[in-house]
Amino acid sequence: MSVLLVCSCNMDITPKNIVSDDDMMGSPKGMSIYMATLYSHMPFEDFKYMAAWGFNFNGWLGTLGIDGSGEAMNRDDVFRTFRGEDNPCWSNAFELIHDANHLIESLPSYRSNFTESEYDFFMGQGYFVRAYVFYQMARRFGGVPLVTHTIAYPNSSDKLEIPRASEEDTWDWICKDFDTAISFLPATSLMSGLPNKYAALAFKAEAMLYAGSVAKYNETVTGRLTGFGDKTGVRVIGFSPDTYRDAYIRYFSEAYK
């Protein structure tokens, strides 16, 4: 004869392996962790980047001594076209953009937990990250889907399938995000290693010089690159013959503002 004993258990407890917005955005300490997460996945072309293999965030390139600096430039067919199979820069970029969008949308609800300077600093980081990631994508793909808000899953296809914007609209948005970041960021960074106002200005200048060069010189050479979205008909690669002159003048002007 067996006896089954059943004890009453309270299973309605908060999982300890899930970090909530209250944990991350409720204090400067939590936001420092959020910043570490963002910047550890930023597509900076430094020691974790090679043209042939893209971005590697696991330290693998560094351990091999072929991290894209100096002698590495002559190794392993480094100049071949990077196709992205090993390191999907497209999907990785949108994961980072999602995190930046979440910061921009959610941090205002926790504003009372920060001083004015702290709040502005972290908001500026969100806009800077989004601007920089879009910039790196535009360099590689031209016009990209401008996902500027968090997308709830699951959802209908019209909410999830955001088409690529034109290349000109993409660069315009990058400029706008950099300007917003610059307006928030202080002259002196509140955290070591994170950009201040002048670092954001420098990256904006770099992005706008790149955009202006593409707008001007791609449109004036034989065999220029251009392309249109299959569904939208939007010029996702290159600039319109009617607008490229105004575009490159605008971008070059933005570079030194």
State where each predicted segment sits.
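Bacterial Sec-dependent N-terminal signal peptides
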Residues: 5-29, 174, 205, 220
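Acidic/histidine-rich, surface-exposed loop or edge segments in extracytoplasmic proteins
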Residues: 16-19, 75-86, 237, 241
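Conserved, well-structured interaction surfaces
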Residues: 27-28, 32-48, 67-141, 157-194
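TPR/Sel1-like alpha-solenoid repeat signature
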Residues: 127, 201-207
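Short coil/turn linking the two alpha-helices of tandem helical-hairpin repeats
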Residues: 138-139, 145, 189, 210-219
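Short, conserved phosphate-binding/catalytic loop or strand-edge motifs used
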Residues: 149-155
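A solvent-exposed, charged loop/short amphipathic helix patch at secondary-structure junctions
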Residues: 220-247
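Polar, glycine-rich mid-to-C-terminal structural blocks
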Residues: 250-257
